[in-house]
Amino acid sequence: VPNLQGPRYISPASNGGFVVSEECGDVKVFTSGHKLLCSLGSKYGHQFGNPAGVCVDVDGSILVADEQRRTVHLFPEHGAPVCLVSAGLRRPAGMACSSFGQLFVADAGENCVKVFKYRARPP
């Protein structure tokens, strides 16, 4: 997939495609045929500082760690973005989410992994 601006982190998406974060830029969503579906910045009107880790949960929502803003946002397929973590992160980098509603964030600023519960309903 050409024409990315500093690709950093990547995650498979529920549609068979993938999501990729761009350094100091945006987060792009691609189809299974590797065509650009959307950019989260444009779709949601969201301004990223330095998007880092990305993951897609069982509901198809995209989670993005912002290294510069020290936050994690959830971007649902429908509806407005939700800030899941706004405190307690120094330099969020890689991320993963479980089917049990747990979010794992590698905090490079504190050399640790932090675990958050973000979904109330069980799988």
Segments the model singles out, each with a brief description of its role:
Residues 47, 57, 63-80:
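Intrinsically disordered, low-complexity segments enriched in Gly and acidic/Ser/Thr residues
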Residues 25, 70, 80, 102, ...:
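Glycine-centered loop/turn positions within well-structured domains
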Residues 91-123:
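Blade-level signature of beta-propeller repeat domains, shared across WD40, Kelch, NHL, RCC1
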Residues 1-17, 24, 45-61, 88-100:
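Beta-rich, blade/repeat-based domains predominating
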Residues 31-35, 75-78, 119-121:
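Short loop/turn segments that connect beta-strands within beta-propeller blades
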Residues 28-29, 38, 63, 72-73, ...:
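WD40 beta-propeller blade core
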Residues 1-2, 35-45, 80-85:
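A short beta-strand motif characteristic of beta-propeller blades
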Residues 20-24, 62-67, 105-109:
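Conserved beta-strand positions in repeat-built beta-propeller and related beta-rich domains
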